[in-house]
Amino acid sequence: MVNPWVGPFEALTERVDADWAGVWALACTACQTLEVVQQTVLGAEDDWVLNLAGYFLVSAFLEVVDVHPEAAHSAETMNPRGLDFGDRDGALAAICLLLNGARRKLTQLAGHTELDLDDQLCALGMHRYLESAAVTIARMLNSRSASLN
């Protein structure tokens, strides 16, 4: 599986600060990427695994918006070149990279002692949903590659 986005997305995740804005940007990019896959890949909009991953992503956003309502208005994606993927599996692999990057930043963020309890709970809840989305997509990729062998 060739994925031209692995390098750029990995570099993006490393440059992001471990704060709410950074985590939010990574998650928004993953969410927009998933939407592009669902709109451009034949049959993807009816794929229950992708829909489940989308549900987990939306749930992660709701965790943040509940505590930080202003976040919904400041959502930014991190791909100025536009989203254009050669194949579905490459896009899904890129989404997993973004989600794993967001989870790493959340772990760092949750370790900050200056966060209040609401932010700590928000970080833990968002981490759980992002992990579920990443695992869901990774299982799909693994089962697809196993069926090709």
Residue ranges of model-derived segments:
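Surface-exposed peri-terminal alpha-helical interaction modules
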Residues: 2, 26, 45, 79-85, ...
